[in-house]
Design a protein with these regions (language model features):
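Conserved micro-motifs of the catalytic ATP-binding
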Residues: 47-49, 88-91, 154
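A conserved beta-strand-to-alpha-helix junction within the catalytic ATP-binding
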Residues: 52-64, 123
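Short beta-strand/loop element within the Bergerat-fold HATPase_c
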Residues: 114-126
Length: 208
């Protein structure tokens, strides 16, 4: 907050553009560190899901809007293909936003030349599926199981807990996550969510 106040006052005064850029860099670094700390806290002290009716398509679009500047900066073409009819599940929307945020972030980091990200929703009577299809470097078959292990990462500066959090949240929601990938052919991350009525049945059965 103090850095942001200093930057605003500096801009208002019209003084020292070089110092202003340094302050902007400091603010971005503090925000990055805040994100890392938040991830670690979520990993070691997970919160209980606050279940409610949640439209996955609305949540996906909201998450993509939140990463719009990053997508533009990295020149990523992101497309949502809505194939699921009534993609409403019984879930914690804030936790699912974290899932989408982490998966999309991994896809962005994995892509370089002509980056394309497709987000596809589909469904059947029991489940709703969300697939993230990227045009990135891919993952070797022997490394795929390691993705969900704590602190495993191939990214420079990565902390290796993002997909572990994804796995835990999906498990807590009665769903699961799968990865299909190979080097040079991109990666497909598939999230499976039980439909609203099925999730409520599972909760009732767990109480009896």
């Amino acid at each position: 907050i103090h850095l942001q106040l200093m930057l605003r006052r500096l801009k208002e005064s019209g003084e020292d553009d070089k110092l202003g850029k340094s302050l902007e860099t400091c603010i971005k670094e503090v925000e990055r560190l805040d994100g890392i700390i938040a991830h670690f806290l979520e990993a070691i002290r997970p919160s209980e899901p606050d279940f409610r009716e949640t439209n996955l398509l609305d949540l996906l679009e909201e998450t993509l809007r939140g990463r719009e500047e990053e997508l533009k900066a990295r020149k990523v073409s992101a497309q949502v293909e809505a194939g699921a009819k009534d993609p409403v599940v019984f879930a914690d929307p804030e936790q699912l936003k974290q899932v989408f945020f982490n998966v999309i972030g991994n896809a962005i980091d994995a892509m370089d030349k002509d980056p394309k990200l497709r987000v596809i929703t589909s469904g059947d009577d029991e489940n709703v599926y969300v697939q993230f299809v990227d045009s990135g470097v891919g993952i070797a078959k022997e490394d795929v199981p390691k993705v969900f292990e704590p602190y495993y990462t191939t990214k420079k500066g990565g902390h290796g807990i993002g997909m572990m959090i994804v796995y835990r949240i999906m498990r807590d929601h009665g769903g699961d996550v799968g990865i299909d990938s190979k080097p040079g052919a991109g990666t497909i991350v598939t999230l499976r969510f039980p439909r609203k009525d099925r999730r409520m049945r599972l909760l009732e059965e767990a109480k009896t």
